C-alpha cells in the first residue's frame, strides 16, 4: 500500500514463518482436479448464494453493514467528459510535469516526441501516438524516474505551403516569398493550437510551456549548425543527379514524401532499338539477311527521347529470335521469349542463344534519332521479372540509369523542366508538352512513325505520387544538395545493432529502406522552410559557404529567425568583416541561394535541440511505421553523420488506424472517427455519445498497436463497457472500506484469513507481471491481465464469498477486518495498475478513498508497492484444492442456491487432508473458511465416508494433484464430495440457511445483534 499511512505486515519473525515450501502457483479455482460424477460439473459460481441482505425490509436492516461510498457506479451523458475536466483541474494535471521535474531522483527517462505535422485538426492517429507515449511516461514517472518529454511540431514544408496557396487561389500568384512565409507561419500556428488543446484534453502529461517548433529561430539555428558540421566533414555536396520531382509542386521530393498509388495506369510499350554494330559474338550468329533489333519494354515512354544506352544482365542467357510476322530478328532474354511472343501476338523461332557478356561492345541506334548510337552496357539492376531482359537507360530519369551513366561517362541531359514539361532541347515536336500527358502521346506517335513501336498496352501498377498534391511524380535530374549516406549507412547499421526495436521485425524494415536509398536529396525549391546557407555567384557556376559565413547566418537566424534570408540585403547577409576572413570576395557578386532544407532534415535534427545532457540520446522514440523511412531514419542518419551515435536506445513502431472492419477511413465511406467527437460527443449524442478521454485511452492500450488498429462504434462501446465493469469493481472496494482505517484496523498478514492471504499472494503476482509488462511497453497485455483479475478473481470469485463477512459480521470483527485489509491492498494495486492508462479514473477513485484525508494526486504517490510476505505459494494448495471441490459441488446443483445445501468432504488421510484442515479445523462448521468458499449451509470434513446417508444425496468423486517444493514432492489424493439438502432454515438477517427456524436468527447473527 502506498497511501502513506502505515508500514506493512509483520516483522522478521513472521516473515521467516511465512517462508513455507509449497508448490508451483496455479490460478484460483483452476480445474486442477480429476473426477467422475453422474452430473455435469461446470467451472462456475452459478448456483452459489450471492445475495446482498435486504436492508430495506425487516427489523434487522440497521444491523447490516452495507457498502457506503459517493463514488458513482456510472457517469451518464455529459457527466463523463465534465468529470474528467473537473479532475484535471482539481488534481493538477497541468502542474504534474513541472512537479516531477523538480523531484530529486537518480534516474531520468527521456521520450523524444516525434513532431506531428502542423497542418490540420487532431485525428485518431494523433490520439494513438500521444496516448501510447503518455502511458509510457506516466508509468516511468510513477516508478521513480524523472520524465523528459518536450512535445514538438513539424512546422515547415510543402504540405503547409500548398494548403495556404490553395486557399488563396489566384491571389497566390502575386505573393512574394515573405508573404507566403507569413501566411504559412500563421496557418501552422493555428493548427498547433488546435492539436495542443486536444492533446492536453486527452490527459497528456508534458512540458506544454516549452514545446519545440521547427520554425523557431533557435531550433533553426541548431539545425543549420548540424548542416554545416556535415558539410565540413564532406558529407554534404551539390550535384546534378536524378531525383523524385513533383511537377505539381515544382520541387524535388524525398522517398518519405511519396505515397504509392496501386491503381496508377501507365502506357507500357515494346520498342525496337535497331542494331547498329553487333558485338563480335552476336555478329557470328546473324547472317545479315534480316534486320536485327534489340527489344526493350518500358512503362515510361516519355523517357525514350533521353535514352543513352541499353543495359543487359551479364550472367543471363539471351536469345536471337526470328519473328514469324515480320521476319525480323530480335534480341531478348532467353527466359522471356515465350511471354513476349504471346504479348506481341506472334511466334518466335529461336535462332541461337548467347550469354549476356557476349553483348559487350555492341551498339544500337536510338529509336527516334537514327544517327545517335546507344551502346549495350552491362548492369546489375536488370531483372527478368518483367519486360524483355534488356533495359532502356535514360540517365537523367532513373537512379540506376544515373549509376550506369556515371560509370561509363554517358551524357545526362535532362529534357524536362520544373513543370514536368519537355524543354526545347527535346525538339519542336515535344517542346512545351507535359511528359505524363500529351508528351507521352507524341513520343508514342513518333515511335510509330519511325516503325520502332511493336506494342502499346495499359498497365495498372504501383506508382509514386506527391504525398500532398496526390499527383504523379517523375524522376528528373537537376542540381540539388545531397547527403552522401553510403558511409553513414554502414556506421548506422552497426549502431542499430545496439538499439532495441519493438516489434523486432521493424529493424529489418528500416535497414532494408536504408539499403534502397542511394543518396539523400535535402534541397527543396520552395520558400516555407529553413534556407540552405549558400550563396551563388551571379555569373559563374560557383557557390560560397564556409564556417565564417555560416556562423554569421546562424547567429542572425538564432536572433531573428530564418526570415532574414528573404528580408536582409546581401551586404548584411555577407558583411565585409565576414568576407575579409575568407579572402574578401565582394558580397554584391553573390546572391542567396533559393533552396530550402528538406523537412525530414528539419525534423531529423530535433535531437540536437531537444535531447538533454551531453549524451543527447533518448531512451525511447515511439512513432508509426511510416517513420521507419522517415523520422526514425533521418534522425539516425543526421545523428550518426554529426556525432557517430544513434539518437535513441529503444524504438517502438505502431501501426495505422483503420475503420473497425479493417478498412481505410474516408469521408466517402462515412467511417472517419474524430477524437473530439469520441471525447465530447457529436451533434446527435444518441448516435455519437460522449465517451470521455479515458475510453479513448483504454482503446489505445487495449489494441494490438504493433499491427493496424481498428476503431469504430463497437470498439468504443466495448472499451466503455470494460471501464464500466472496472468502475463497479472499484465501487465495491471503496464502499466496503468506508469504516476502515488502515493505521488502526489492519490485520497482520499471518493472522488474516487464508483466503485473504491467498488474494494478497495473487495480488503480488499480478503486480509483478504488470510492472514487467509496462517495462516492455506491452500495454495490451496489461489491460488483459487487469481485466481478467477484476472480472474473474475479484467480481466472480473473491467478492462473491466475502460479502457475508463484510455485511453481517461485527464491524470490528477480525474476520471482517481481515478481508478489509485485503480490499485496501487490492484497491491500491488495481488503481496504480491502471493509472497510466486511465489517469482520470485513477484520480477520481483517489478522491473517494475514505482513509486519505487530503488527497492530491495518485501520480505523486509512487508505483505499486507489495510485500514479500504476501508471497505464499503454499496457500494455493489449500485454496485451489478447496476450489476444485467447490466447483464439483456447484456443478452438481446448477441454478440452485448453494446455501440450501450442506456439504461433506471426505479426503483420505495424507497431505490433501492436512492442507484442507487449514481451512476448517473442526469437523463441521457453518462459519469456517472452507464453508465460506463452499458458500453452503455447513461443511463437514471427514477422513472416511459416513456410514449412513439419506437417499437424496449427490456423491461426487475427484482427485487433486498436490505439488510441493517446486515439484520435488508430488502426491495425488482422492476426495469425495457429498451434497445433501440442509435441514436448517433461512436466517432473516444474513439469509444463510443456518437458523433453527425462519423467524429466529442464526447463532452468528444473534451474537452480532446482541452486541449492538
From Swiss-Prot:
The keyword Iron does not apply. It is found in: Mitochondrion matrix. ATP binds at residues 664, 667. One of its GO terms (cellular component) is mitochondrion. The modification N6-succinyllysine is found at residues 74, 194, 241, 479, 500, 775, 781. The modification N6-acetyllysine is found at residues 74, 189, 233, 241, 725, 775, 781. PROSITE patterns: AA_TRNA_LIGASE_I. Residues 1-48 form a transit peptide. It catalyses: tRNA(Ile) + L-isoleucine + ATP = L-isoleucyl-tRNA(Ile) + AMP + diphosphate. Its EC number is 6.1.1.5. Pfam families: Anticodon_1, tRNA-synt_1, zf-FPG_IleRS. Changing residue 227 to S: In CAGSSS; uncertain significance. One of its GO terms (molecular function) is tRNA binding. It comes from the Eukaryota. A motif ('KMSKS' region) lies at residues 664-668. Keywords: Acetylation, Aminoacyl-tRNA synthetase, ATP-binding, Cataract, Deafness, Disease variant, Ligase, Mitochondrion, Neuropathy, Nucleotide-binding, Protein biosynthesis, Transit peptide. Signal peptide: none annotated. Its main location: mitochondrion. It is an enzyme of class 6 (ligase). Belongs to the class-I aminoacyl-tRNA synthetase family. It is linked to Cataracts, growth hormone deficiency, sensory neuropathy, sensorineural hearing loss, and skeletal dysplasia: An autosomal recessive disorder characterized by cataracts, short-stature secondary to growth hormone deficiency, sensorineural hearing deficit, peripheral sensory neuropathy, skeletal dysplasia, scoliosis, and facial dysmorphism. Aminoacyl-tRNA synthetase that catalyzes the specific attachment of isoleucine to its cognate tRNA (tRNA(Ile)). This is Isoleucine--tRNA ligase, mitochondrial.
Amino acid at each position: 500500500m502506498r497511501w502513506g499511512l502505515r508500514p506493512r505486515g509483520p516483522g522478521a519473525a513472521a516473515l521467516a514463518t511465512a517462508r513455507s515450501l509449497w508448490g508451483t502457483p496455479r490460478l484460483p479455482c483452476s480445474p486442477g482436479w480429476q473426477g467422475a460424477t453422474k452430473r455435469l460439473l461446470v467451472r462456475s459460481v452459478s448456483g452459489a448464494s450471492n445475495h446482498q441482505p435486504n436492508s430495506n425490509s425487516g427489523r434487522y436492516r440497521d444491523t447490516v453493514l452495507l457498502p457506503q461510498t459517493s463514488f458513482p457506479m456510472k457517469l451518464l451523458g455529459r457527466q463523463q467528459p465534465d468529470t474528467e475536466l473537473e479532475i484535471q483541474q482539481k488534481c493538477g494535471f497541468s502542474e504534474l510535469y513541472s512537479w516531477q521535474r523538480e523531484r530529486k531522483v537518480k534516474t531520468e527517462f527521456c521520450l523524444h516526441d516525434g513532431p506531428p505535422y502542423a497542418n490540420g485538426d487532431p485525428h485518431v492517429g494523433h490520439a494513438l501516438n500521444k496516448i501510447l507515449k503518455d502511458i509510457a511516461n506516466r508509468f516511468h514517472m510513477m516508478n521513480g524516474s524523472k520524465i523528459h518529454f518536450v512535445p514538438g511540431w513539424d512546422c515547415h514544408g510543402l504540405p503547409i505551403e500548398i494548403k495556404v496557396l490553395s486557399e488563396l487561389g489566384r491571389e497566390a500568384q502575386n505573393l512574394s516569398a515573405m508573404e507566403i512565409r507569413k501566411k504559412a507561419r500563421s496557418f501552422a500556428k493555428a493548427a498547433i493550437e488546435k492539436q495542443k488543446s486536444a492533446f492536453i484534453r486527452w490527459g497528456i502529461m508534458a512540458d506544454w510551456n516549452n514545446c519545440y517548433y521547427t520554425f523557431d529561430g533557435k531550433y533553426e539555428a541548431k539545425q543549420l549548425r548540424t548542416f554545416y558540421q556535415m558539410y565540413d566533414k564532406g558529407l554534404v555536396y551539390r550535384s546534378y543527379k536524378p531525383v523524385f520531382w513533383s511537377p505539381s509542386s515544382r520541387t524535388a521530393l524525398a522517398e518519405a514524401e511519396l505515397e504509392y498509388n496501386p491503381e496508377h495506369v501507365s502506357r507500357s510499350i515494346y520498342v525496337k532499338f535497331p542494331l547498329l554494330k553487333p558485338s563480335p559474338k552476336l555478329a557470328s550468329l546473324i547472317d545479315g539477311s534480316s534486320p536485327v533489333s534489340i527489344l526493350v519494354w518500358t512503362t515510361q515512354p516519355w523517357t525514350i527521347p533521353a535514352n543513352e544506352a541499353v543495359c543487359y544482365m551479364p550472367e543471363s542467357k539471351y536469345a536471337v529470335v526470328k519473328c514469324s510476322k515480320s521476319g525480323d530478328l530480335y534480341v531478348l532474354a532467353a527466359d522471356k521469349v515465350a511471354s513476349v511472343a504471346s504479348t506481341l501476338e506472334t511466334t518466335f523461332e529461336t535462332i541461337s542463344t548467347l550469354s549476356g557478356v557476349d553483348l559487350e561492345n555492341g551498339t544500337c541506334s536510338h529509336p527516334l534519332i537514327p544517327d545517335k548510337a546507344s551502346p549495350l552496357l552491362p548492369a546489375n539492376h536488370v531483372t527478368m521479372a518483367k519486360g524483355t531482359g534488356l533495359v532502356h537507360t535514360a540517365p537523367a530519369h532513373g537512379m540506376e540509369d544515373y549509376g550506369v551513366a556515371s560509370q561509363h561517362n554517358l551524357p545526362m541531359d535532362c529534357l524536362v523542366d520544373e513543370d514536368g514539361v519537355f524543354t526545347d532541347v527535346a525538339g519542336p515536336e515535344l517542346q512545351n508538352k507535359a511528359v505524363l500527358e500529351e508528351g507521352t502521346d507524341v513520343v508514342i506517335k513518333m515511335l510509330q512513325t519511325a516503325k520502332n513501336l511493336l506494342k502499346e498496352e495499359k498497365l495498372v501498377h504501383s506508382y509514386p505520387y506527391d504525398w500532398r498534391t496526390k499527383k504523379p511524380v517523375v524522376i528528373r535530374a537537376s542540381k540539388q544538395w545531397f547527403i552522401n549516406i553510403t558511409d553513414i549507412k554502414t556506421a548506422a547499421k552497426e549502431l542499430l545493432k545496439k538499439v532495441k526495436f519493438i516489434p523486432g521485425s521493424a529493424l529489418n524494415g528500416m535497414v532494408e529502406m536504408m539499403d534502397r536509398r542511394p543518396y539523400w536529396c535535402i534541397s527543396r525549391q520552395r520558400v516555407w522552410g529553413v534556407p540552405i546557407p549558400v550563396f551563388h555567384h551571379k555569373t559563374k557556376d560557383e557557390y560560397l559557404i564556409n564556417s565564417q559565413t555560416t556562423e554569421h547566418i546562424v547567429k542572425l537566424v538564432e536572433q531573428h529567425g530564418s526570415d532574414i534570408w528573404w528580408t536582409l540585403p546581401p551586404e548584411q547577409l555577407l558583411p565585409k568583416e565576414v568576407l575579409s576572413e575568407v579572402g574578401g570576395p565582394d558580397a554584391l557578386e553573390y546572391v542567396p541561394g533559393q533552396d530550402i532544407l528538406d523537412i525530414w532534415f528539419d525534423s531529423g535534427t530535433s535531437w540536437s535541440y531537444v535531447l538533454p545532457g551531453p549524451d543527447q540520446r533518448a531512451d525511447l522514440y515511439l512513432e508509426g511505421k511510416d517513420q521507419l523511412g522517415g523520422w526514425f531514419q533521418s534522425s539516425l542518419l543526421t545523428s550518426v553523420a554529426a556525432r557517430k551515435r544513434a539518437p535513441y536506445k529503444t524504438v517502438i513502431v505502431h501501426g495505422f488506424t483503420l475503420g473497425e472492419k479493417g478498412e481505410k477511413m474516408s469521408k466517402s465511406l462515412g467511417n472517419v472517427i474524430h477524437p473530439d467527437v469520441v471525447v465530447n460527443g457529436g451533434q446527435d449524442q444518441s448516435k455519437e455519445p460522449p465517451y470521455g478521454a479515458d475510453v479513448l485511452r483504454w482503446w489505445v492500450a487495449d489494441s494490438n498497436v504493433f499491427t493496424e488498429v481498428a476503431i469504430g462504434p463497437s470498439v468504443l462501446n466495448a472499451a466503455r463497457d470494460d471501464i464500466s465493469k472496472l468502475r463497479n469493481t472499484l465501487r465495491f472496494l471503496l464502499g466496503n472500506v468506508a469504516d476502515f482505517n488502515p493505521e488502526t484496523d489492519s490485520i497482520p498478514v499471518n493472522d488474516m484469513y487464508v483466503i485473504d492471504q491467498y488474494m494478497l499472494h495473487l495480488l503480488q503476482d499480478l503486480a509483478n507481471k504488470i510492472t514487467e509488462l509496462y517495462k516492455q511497453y506491452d500495454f495490451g497485455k496489461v489491460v488483459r491481465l487487469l481485466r481478467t483479475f477484476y472480472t474473474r478473481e475479484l467480481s466472480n470469485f473473491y467478492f462473491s464469498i466475502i460479502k457475508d463477512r463484510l455485511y453481517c459480521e461485527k464491524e470490528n470483527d477480525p474476520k471482517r477486518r481481515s478481508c478489509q485489509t485485503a480490499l485496501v491492498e487490492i484497491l491500491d494495486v488495481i488503481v496504480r495498475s491502471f493509472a497510466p492508462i486511465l489517469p482520470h479514473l485513477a484520480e477520481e477513485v483517489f478522491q473517494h478513498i475514505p482513509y486519505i484525508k487530503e488527497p492530491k494526486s495518485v501520480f505523486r504517490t509512487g508505483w505499486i508497492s507489495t510485500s514479500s510476505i504476501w508471497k505464499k505459494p503454499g496457500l494455493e494448495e489449500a485454496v485451489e484444492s478447496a476450489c476444485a471441490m467447490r466447483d464439483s459441488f456447484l456443478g452438481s446443483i446448477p441454478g440452485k442456491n448453494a446455501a440450501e445445501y450442506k456439504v461433506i468432504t471426505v479426503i483420505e488421510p495424507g497431505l490433501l487432508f492436512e492442507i484442507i484442515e487449514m481451512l476448517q479445523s473442526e469437523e463441521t462448521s457453518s462459519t469456517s473458511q472452507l464453508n465460506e468458499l463452499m458458500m453452503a449451509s455447513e461443511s463437514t470434513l471427514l477422513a472416511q465416508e459416513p456410514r449412513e446417508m439419506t437417499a437424496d444425496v449427490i456423491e461426487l468423486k475427484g482427485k487433486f494433484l498436490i505439488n510441493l517444493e517446486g515439484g520435488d514432492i508430488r502426491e495425488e489424493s482422492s476426495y469425495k464430495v457429498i451434497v445433501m439438502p440442509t435441514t436448517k432454515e433461512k436466517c432473516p438477517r444474513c439469509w444463510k440457511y443456518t437458523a433453527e427456524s425462519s423467524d429466529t436468527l442464526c447463532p452468528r447473527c444473534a451474537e452480532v445483534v446482541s452486541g449492538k
